[in-house]
UniProtKB/Swiss-Prot annotation:
Signal peptide start-end: 1-19
Phylogenetic lineage: Eukaryota, Metazoa, Spiralia, Lophotrochozoa, Mollusca
Tissue distribution of the protein: Expressed by the venom duct.
Propeptide segment residues: 20-42
Cysteines paired by S-S bonds: 46-60, 53-64, 59-69
Protein's UniProt name: Gamma-conotoxin-like TxMEKL-053
Source species of the chain: Conus textile (Cloth-of-gold cone)
Function: Gamma-conotoxins may act on voltage-gated non-specific cation pacemaker channels (HCN).
Taxonomic superkingdom: Eukaryota
Length: 78
């Protein structure tokens, strides 16, 4: 009877450990997926034409004149 009790306790500990590991793995997977945004959401994170900016990456056109987003980047010889 003692051996059966010990066996049941060991089985319970193993099952709870496995369940805990699965839960943490699933939570990490959800966190990883939630960091990604669809392209439509990423588009609106950039500034449209004539929005305030300080660097090119803040503008949808990828062209900032240090004050406002430009409609499009101009050639360097302008």
């Amino acid at each position: 009877m003692e051996k059966l009790t010990i066996l049941l306790l060991v089985a319970a500990v193993l099952m709870s450990t496995q369940a805990l590991n699965q839960e943490q793995h699933q939570r990490a997977k959800i966190n990883l997926l939630s960091k990604r945004k669809p392209p439509a959401e990423r588009w609106w994170e950039c500034g449209i034409w004539f929005s305030r900016c300080t660097k090119d990456s803040e503008c949808c056109s990828n062209s900032c004149d240090q004050t406002y987003c430009e409609l499009m980047p101009f050639p360097p010889d302008w």
